[in-house]
């Protein structure tokens, strides 16, 4: 009998028949399938609710921070080892000014969950103890580097690098840096000489600096011992600390923290001997001659062998020879001689400088006044015109007088009587409208003959005529009516050329004659009846024309000292001024005036 359709009878597969699904035509119904699908166990697989964006930027920022932290930890592990400072400089690590407590902190962050943390990754602020060899108190030999630890990295990280540099300087040179220098607190204070100590400079740069500094300095002193280099430089112009540091950092390629700079001690013999004896060493480079402050304290010369006492007569002789009469000029000019003149140095070191200056000025005025009184007018004019340098044209004066319609022959005759103090011919008046050159003409003559000028504004003082006793020729400028009244009342005898009693300050009234007197005024005294007693005592010349000027606003007639020098030289015989000068030139030789205690044969 055949097997039923859809089944196979085989041994060992009986269970399959039990599990075989039953077929039905109902499975082909699509509506029933969809209805059953809605009742499935995975009906909530898809979320059909509205979607919210959330804070994505905060998440992105958190991820970036984690990446940065990981990179930072890698760099710390690579470059910031706890033993890095000790490996760079054990000696620097051993230096401690105060005890430090050990404080532990976590140097590297952990990447695990935070459990089972140990102290293996904790680093101490203070490095472990390092065995440091004993320091040798003896300076290192010149040019010998040895096993010097040039820990410039530790120097830059030190809190007080100046103290470390000073310690290394004293260790190298055997003398303190402050023993050779004086302190400038300001960086803007200028000085010509500077002491510079530089740490950890390459040898090639030191050699090159020996040549480069020569163009900036008059004197260079360089010495290198170990890692320290010492410079003494005297610049051609004053420099402040900032400029010096800028020059040295550029030239030596170093950091400013590696430099110590202060000006040297100028009045310390021990410091001067350090530089003087050091320049004789084999490892020292020097350029130029010794500065004055080193030479004066270490080198014995004729100036230092002289006595250091002040000699007032030497100061008076100097002021007399150089025509210094004012106290301010004497003090300033004599102080400028101090570096080369031992007497000026002694004067500066004295406590009574002002007293000596006043006494010197008084003595010079006494000598000059006595010299003037001894000279005649011819000698005086001859002396003063020969002090004028250069040559001029005497025709300028003649042309100006002709321009003002002045008879030159009459003017020459009046000038001759004026210079020889002829009675009642001892005063010349130049009158006319303003701006005609009266003051310019007379002032130029007073200037070349070293005369004095009177001012009537001081007439309330009884000493206003005192300058008449100290000159050979005087000028009273711009005489007005009150001045004419005063002259008509009190000065008739003086204009006559007779002796008068002249009251001088701090002195008894003295007997003297008026010197040659020049007057300028806008009033023609000869036309004034009220002053008829002055007509015979004053010779007048009128200046009617305005003073001519060029297009560039300069005088057309240049009335200079050289013009008057040429005028007197040309008209010397016409003015009858030749006798005294002929005796001076062709007679016996004249000895220069000497007012000091130095003998004439003494060596200069």
UniProtKB/Swiss-Prot annotation:
Its EC number is 5.6.2.4. It is an enzyme of class 5 (isomerase). ATP-dependent DNA 3'-5' helicase required for initiation of viral DNA replication. It forms a complex with the viral E2 protein. The E1-E2 complex binds to the replication origin which contains binding sites for both proteins. During the initial step, a dimer of E1 interacts with a dimer of protein E2 leading to a complex that binds the viral origin of replication with high specificity. Then, a second dimer of E1 displaces the E2 dimer in an ATP-dependent manner to form the E1 tetramer. GO terms for biological process: DNA replication. There is a cross-link at residue 513 (Glycyl lysine isopeptide (Lys-Gly) (interchain with G-Cter in SUMO)). InterPro entries: Helicase_SF3_DNA-vir (IPR014015), P-loop_NTPase (IPR027417), PPV_DNA_helicase_E1_C (IPR001177), PPV_DNA_helicase_E1_N (IPR014000), PPV_E1_DBD (IPR046832), PPV_E1_DBD_sf (IPR046935), Rep_E1_papillomaV (IPR016393), Znf_lg_T-Ag_D1_dom_sf (IPR037102). Belongs to the papillomaviridae E1 protein family. Residues 144-307 are annotated as: DNA-binding region. Its main location: host cell. The modification Phosphoserine is found at residues 81, 89. This is Replication protein E1. One of its GO terms (cellular component) is host cell nucleus. Residues 579-604 are annotated as: Disordered. The gene is E1. A motif (Nuclear localization signal) lies at residues 76-78. The keyword Transferase does not apply. Keywords: ATP-binding, DNA replication, DNA-binding, Early protein, Helicase, Host nucleus, Hydrolase, Isomerase, Isopeptide bond, Nucleotide-binding, Phosphoprotein, Ubl conjugation. ATP binds at residues 432-439. It catalyses: Couples ATP hydrolysis with the unwinding of duplex DNA by translocating in the 3'-5' direction; ATP + H2O = ADP + phosphate + H(+). GO terms for molecular function: ATP binding; ATP hydrolysis activity; DNA binding; DNA helicase activity. Can form hexamers. Interacts with E2 protein; this interaction increases E1 DNA binding specificity. Interacts with host DNA polymerase subunit POLA2. Interacts with host single stranded DNA-binding protein RPA1. Interacts with host TOP1; this interaction stimulates the enzymatic activity of TOP1. It is found in: Host nucleus. Phosphorylated. The lineage of its organism: Viruses, Monodnaviria, Shotokuvirae, Cossaviricota, Papovaviricetes. Residues 587-604 have a biased composition (Polar residues). PROSITE patterns: SF3_HELICASE_1. Residues 406-556 form the SF3 helicase domain. It comes from the Viruses.
């Amino acid at each position: 009998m055949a097997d039923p359709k859809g089944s196979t009878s085989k041994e060992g597969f009986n269970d399959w028949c039990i599990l075989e699904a039953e077929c039905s035509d109902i499975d082909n119904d699509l509506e029933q399938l969809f209805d059953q699908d809605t009742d499935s166990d995975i009906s909530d697989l898809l979320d059909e609710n509205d979607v919210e964006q959330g804070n994505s930027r905060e998440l992105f920022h958190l991820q970036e921070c984690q990446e940065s932290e990981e990179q930072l930890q890698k760099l710390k592990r690579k470059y910031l080892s706890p033993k890095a400072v000790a490996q760079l400089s054990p000696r620097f690590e051993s230096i401690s000014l105060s005890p430090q407590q050990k404080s532990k902190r976590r140097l590297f962050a952990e990447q695990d969950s935070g459990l089972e943390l140990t102290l293996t990754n904790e680093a101490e602020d203070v490095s472990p103890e390092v065995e440091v060899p004993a320091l040798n108190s003896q300076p290192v030999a010149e040019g010998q580097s040895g096993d010097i630890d040039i820990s410039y990295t530790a120097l830059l990280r030190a809190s007080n690098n100046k103290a470390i540099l000073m310690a290394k300087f004293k260790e190298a040179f055997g003398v303190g840096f402050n023993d050779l220098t004086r302190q400038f607190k300001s960086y803007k204070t200028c000085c010509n000489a500077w002491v510079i100590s530089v740490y950890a400079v390459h040898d090639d740069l030191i050699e090159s600096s020996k040549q480069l500094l020569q163009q900036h300095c008059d004197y260079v002193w360089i010495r290198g011992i170990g890692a320290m280099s010492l410079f003494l430089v005297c610049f051609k112009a004053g420099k402040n600390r900032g400029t010096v540091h800028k020059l040295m950092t550029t030239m030596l390629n170093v950091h400013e923290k590696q430099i110590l700079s202060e000006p040297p001690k100028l009045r310390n013999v021990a410091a001067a001997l350090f530089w003087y004896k050091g320049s004789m060493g084999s490892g020292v480079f020097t350029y130029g001659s010794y500065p004055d402050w080193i030479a004066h304290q270490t080198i014995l010369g004729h100036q230092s062998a002289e006595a250091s006492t002040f000699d007032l007569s030497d100061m008076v002789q100097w002021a007399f020879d150089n025509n210094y009469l004012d106290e301010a000029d004497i003090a300033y000019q004599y102080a400028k001689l101090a570096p080369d003149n031992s007497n000026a140095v002694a004067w500066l070191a004295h406590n009574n400088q002002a007293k000596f200056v006043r006494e010197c000025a008084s003595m010079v005025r006494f000598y000059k006044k006595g010299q003037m009184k001894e000279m005649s007018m011819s000698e005086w004019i001859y002396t003063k015109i020969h002090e004028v340098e250069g040559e001029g044209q005497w025709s300028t004066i003649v042309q100006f007088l002709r321009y003002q319609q002045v008879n030159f022959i009459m003017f020459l005759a009046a000038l001759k009587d004026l210079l020889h103090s002829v009675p009642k011919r001892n005063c010349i008046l130049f009158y006319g409208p303003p701006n005609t050159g009266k003051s310019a003409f007379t002032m130029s003559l007073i200037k070349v003959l070293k005369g004095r000028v009177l001012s009537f504004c001081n007439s309330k003082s009884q000493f206003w005529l005192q300058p008449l006793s100290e000159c050979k020729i005087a000028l009273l400028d711009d005489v007005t009516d009150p001045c004419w009244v005063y002259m008509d009342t009190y000065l008739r005898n003086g204009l006559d050329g007779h002796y008068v009693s002249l009251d001088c300050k701090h002195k008894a009234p003295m007997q003297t004659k008026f010197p040659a007197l020049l007057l300028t005024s806008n009033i023609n005294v000869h036309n004034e009846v009220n002053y008829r007693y002055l007509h015979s005592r004053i010779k007048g010349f009128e200046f009617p024309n305005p003073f001519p000027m060029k297009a560039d606003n300069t005088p057309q007639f240049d009335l200079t000292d050289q013009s008057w020098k040429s005028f007197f030289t040309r008209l010397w015989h016409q003015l009858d001024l030749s006798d005294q000068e002929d005796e001076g030139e062709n007679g016996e030789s004249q000895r220069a005036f000497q007012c000091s205690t130095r003998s004439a044969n003494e060596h200069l």
